[in-house]
Regions:
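Radical SAM enzyme [4Fe-4S]-AdoMet core and its adjacent flexible, acidic
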Residues: 143-151, 158, 162-276, 280, ...
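Flexible mid-to-C-terminal extensions adjoining Fe-S/redox cofactors in radical SAM and related proteins
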Residues: 300-412
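Conserved alpha-helical substructure of the radical SAM core
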Residues: 1-117, 121-123
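Short loop/turn microsegments at loop-to-beta-strand junctions
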Residues: 13, 281-283
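Conserved AdoMet/S-adenosylmethionine-binding subsite of the radical SAM
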Residues: 56, 78-197, 204-206, 210
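Short Gly/Pro-enriched turn/cap motifs at secondary-structure boundaries
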Residues: 273-277, 284, 328-332
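Short, acidic, Ser/Thr-enriched surface-loop or helix-capping motifs
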Residues: 288
Length: 412
């Protein structure tokens, strides 16, 4: 008998089939050090027994006819193809009439013709991590021997394109590349990548007894320091404004930039489709290779562990009071400055992970990137207003491209 979640929304838990294991050693990776949480495990590999248990329970816990599996790392392709073929067999075994979709995130360096044929034949969506042109990408994305990875990533992308695999780009915006948004954007356009996520990297350093060095919200501010690779609020704001100017003039409806789509969704009062911009979070859990479930991919810390699938069901963990409180914390912990901000509806304070700054009155809990977001929202507001009006009147938001000249706002 199926166990149904008490809320009419999909239960969503990302899978980590190899935990934090990866063939790269990117300087800014927030997940690589999670392996130190599992030092007692000699092999960070998800067993077939656990794979089947998760798939059966995950599918049966859904209240929707469509089920999304997201495979994340570490580097997902360090599991052999046979593992994912077995996963699909199990998905079909337990589907019970539901439609199953799969997406997988990879650094692209291990892609082969065989992998790409599998993804194409089974309609998998592939997300590729690539930080723009070679100079930007190779600054921080190196292998364990310190050698750059760009050439291998491009070989992988070319294989995806050769086989007609649907793929998206995921780029980290850091201190080094943030000053070149158009170089970044044009690179993806030249690759023929129409769906792009630009993710700002912000991390704090706080040594822990177990060897981890990245801070969680529980680490006191006076014991942390900002990581050198972090993008600054000013850089982030300038990056978004310059990128938006280019996009809104000629690419609306052709190229999809996640943050712009999410902003427009919030502008019209719809769900933004990404937890960082939503009013509450906690809808996207993550399961490690051994069955441990955590509140969020960015909160894989001991204090945010919900339990283990061998002791508790996914429904019990994801709809637990602890997880409910985690999700509501996003809204409840907003400082007064945010609650009174004219742009609160657009960002909802962004990700709690980045809320370690102080307001002008000294109140804690302000998002470190706040100034950058405020600059962007003010800059984009007239165009968001226009696109909102088009959507409300059942017209395509892409009409904004024809109106840019007439609006004569800012410096477009």
């Amino acid at each position: 008998m199926s166990t149904y979640a008490p809320f009419a929304k999909p239960l969503y838990v990302m899978l980590k089939p190899v935990g934090a294991v990866c063939n790269l050693a990117c300087d800014y990776c927030y997940y690589l050090e999670k392996a130190k949480l599992y030092r007692e495990n000699p092999k960070h590999v998800m067993s077939e027994e656990l794979l089947e248990k998760f798939i059966e329970e995950y599918i049966n816990s859904q209240t929707m006819p469509q089920v999304l599996f997201t495979w994340h790392g570490g580097e997902t392709l360090m599991r052999p193809l046979a593992f994912y073929k077995r996963a699909m067999e199990l998905q079909k075994k337990y589907a019970n009439g539901r439609t199953i979709d799969n997406c997988i995130q990879t650094n692209g360096t291990l892609l082969t013709d065989e992998w790409c044929r599998f993804f194409k034949e089974n309609n998998w969506l592939v997300g590729v991590s690539i930080d723009g042109p070679q100079e930007f990408h190779d600054e921080y994305r190196k292998n364990k021997q310190g050698k750059p990875s760009f050439v291998k990533v491009m070989q992988g992308i070319n294989l995806l394109k050769k086989h007609g695999v649907e793929w998206n780009g995921m780029a980290v915006v850091n201190d080094y590349n943030a000053d070149y948004p158009l170089d970044f954007y044009n690179f993806f356009k030249e690759l023929g990548c129409h769906y792009i996520q630009f993710a700002p990297i912000v991390e704090r350093i706080a040594p822990h007894r177990d060897g981890r060095h990245l801070a969680s919200l529980q680490d006191k501010e006076n014991s942390t320091e900002l990581a050198d690779f972090s993008v600054s609020p000013e850089q982030w704001g300038n990056f978004l404004c310059t990128l938006f100017d280019e996009w809104v003039k000629q690419d609306v409806g052709t190229y999809y930039i996640q943050l712009f789509d999410s902003t427009l969704a919030n502008w019209i009062g719809e769900q933004p489709g990404v937890c960082s911009m939503a009013k509450t979070c906690g809808h996207a859990g993550v399961m490690e290779f051994n069955g441990d479930v955590y509140a969020c991919d960015h909160f894989v810390f001991p204090e945010y562990k919900l339990g283990n699938i061998y002791q508790k069901t996914l429904v019990e963990m994801m709809y637990s009071e602890k997880q409910q409180n985690f999700g509501l914390m996003k809204q409840r912990s907003l400082p007064t400055q945010c609650k009174e901000c004219e742009w609160l509806f657009a960002c909802n304070g962004e990700c709690p992970k980045n809320r370690f700054a102080h307001t002008s009155n000294g109140e804690p809990g302000l998002n470190y990137l706040c100034a950058g977001y405020r600059k962007f929202f003010k800059h984009a507001a007239p165009y968001m207003d226009f696109m909102k009006n088009e959507l409300m009147n059942q017209r395509p938001p892409a009409n904004v491209m024809e109106a840019v000249g007439r609006l004569k706002i800012d410096n477009l």
